[in-house]
């Protein structure tokens, strides 16, 4: 492990709190020690931290608040500053500076903002500063949220050009069944490609404080691995888990990176949270999956959500299965007008056209 590597460490709420209602500072101190040790060896470390709402609730004395988005955002606004203060305080013991990055889905959906976020993150790393990343929960609405820090960590790994992504949780890894209810469940140590069978056995996190269960960790691993980034799911309370993961020692479930990773633009398409979705017919599904064809308006049955031209959208088949993500050539209003129509009719219907396809195959990733 002599060469410098970049590691993204995602710390879930259940890891930071130990399953309690407050931050477990002793455990966070130990996690920082492990990161600082790798930093001193010349490695580049990125932290994706949950816990802002838990920190806010603790700081305010566990107030009785209505179960509303505004209440969560209030707690996040208070807790975010407490959280970054804690990271800064602990890393400063080792003479390490931290830099905070708060992101929303909009930063990932827009290619220019995605590149700006990438440049900022890499500038921090180039100057030996540890980026501390969280979703901007104080302002993010359901429409602009990435949704969970597992998927955010996969996007951060792509932005950072990471070698490895470590998802620390309250479970030792991915099991063949739920270990809490099935004593015969076995730890899956290595995964080479994520399929529907693997997704089916992914259970939910035992913690009620976070938003990400094992299913979202599989989503994150899928995104990272297809971008050429090894991903490990491991228990946050395992001794020296961060250093051992960096060394390549078995610490949980290792999802091995795709041998031929996606090129940079397609990494963005694959990782960006979809702004909307299209449901397509059987003919379009077959053309996309079997021939790698572009999506024509003729094959579109339903347009869901509101999105602009140039945004990433999800493409589903008639059974609701996610078959592809791609960049839309038309906005949602235009697609509703031309859905089910032949491409030759686009100009007559809209009064303009951006070409005959709704999503070009060069701007599409098969899921």
Swiss-Prot record:
Annotated metabolic or biological route of this protein: Amino-acid biosynthesis; L-proline biosynthesis; L-glutamate 5-semialdehyde from L-glutamate: step 1/2
Residue ranges constituting the PUA domain according to the UniProt record: 275-353
InterPro entries: AceGlu_kinase-like_sf (IPR036393), Asp/Glu/Uridylate_kinase (IPR001048), G5K_ProB (IPR041739), Glu/AcGlu_kinase (IPR001057), Glu_5kinase (IPR011529), Glu_5kinase/COase_Synthase (IPR005715), Glutamate_5-kinase_CS (IPR019797), PUA (IPR002478)
Pfam families reported in the protein's UniProt record: AA_kinase (PF00696), PUA (PF01472)
Catalytic activity: L-glutamate + ATP = L-glutamyl 5-phosphate + ADP
Signal peptide (residue range): none
Record-level GO BP terms: L-proline biosynthetic process
First-level EC class: transferase
Family annotation (HAMAP family): ProB
Function: Catalyzes the transfer of a phosphate group to glutamate to form L-glutamate 5-phosphate.
Location (main, coarse): cytoplasm
Residues annotated to bind ATP: 10, 169-170, 211-217
Stored NCBIfam families: proB
Protein name as annotated: Glutamate 5-kinase
């Amino acid at each position: 492990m002599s060469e410098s590597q970049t590691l993204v460490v995602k710390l879930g709420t259940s890891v930071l709190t130990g399953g309690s209602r407050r931050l477990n500072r002793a455990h966070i101190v130990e996690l920082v020690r492990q990161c600082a040790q790798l930093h001193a060896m010349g490695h580049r470390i990125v932290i994706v931290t949950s816990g802002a709402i838990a920190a806010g609730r603790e700081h305010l004395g566990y107030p009785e608040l209505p179960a509303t988005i505004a209440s969560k955002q209030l707690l996040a606004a208070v807790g975010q500053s407490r959280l970054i203060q804690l990271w800064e305080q602990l890393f400063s013991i080792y003479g390490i500076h931290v830099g905070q990055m708060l992101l929303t889905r909009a930063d990932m959906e827009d290619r220019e903002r995605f590149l700006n976020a990438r440049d900022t993150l890499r500038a921090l790393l180039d100057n030996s500063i540890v980026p501390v990343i969280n979703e901007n929960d104080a302002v993010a609405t359901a429409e602009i949220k990435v949704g969970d820090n597992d998927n955010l960590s996969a996007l951060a790994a792509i932005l950072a050009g990471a070698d490895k992504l470590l998802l620390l949780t309250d479970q030792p890894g991915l099991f063949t069944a739920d270990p809490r209810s099935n004593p015969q469940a076995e730890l899956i140590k290595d995964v080479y490609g994520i399929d529907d069978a693997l997704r089916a056995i992914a259970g939910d996190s035992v913690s009620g404080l976070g938003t990400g269960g094992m299913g979202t960790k599989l989503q994150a691993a899928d995104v990272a691995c297809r971008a050429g980034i090894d991903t490990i799911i491991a228990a946050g309370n395992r001794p020296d888990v961060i250093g051992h993961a960096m060394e390549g020692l078995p610490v949980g479930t290792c999802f091995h990176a795709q041998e031929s990773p996606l090129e940079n633009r397609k990494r963005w398409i694959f990782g960006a949270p979809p702004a909307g979705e299209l449901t397509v017919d059987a003919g379009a599904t077959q053309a996309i999956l079997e021939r790698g064809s572009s999506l024509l308006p003729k094959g579109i049955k339903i347009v869901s959500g509101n999105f602009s031209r140039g945004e990433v959208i999800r493409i589903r088949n008639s059974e609701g299965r996610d078959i592809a993500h791609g960049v839309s050539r038309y906005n949602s209003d235009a697609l509703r007008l031309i859905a089910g129509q032949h491409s030759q009719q686009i100009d007559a219907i809209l009064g303009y056209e951006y070409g005959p396809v709704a999503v070009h195959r060069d701007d599409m990733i098969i899921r």
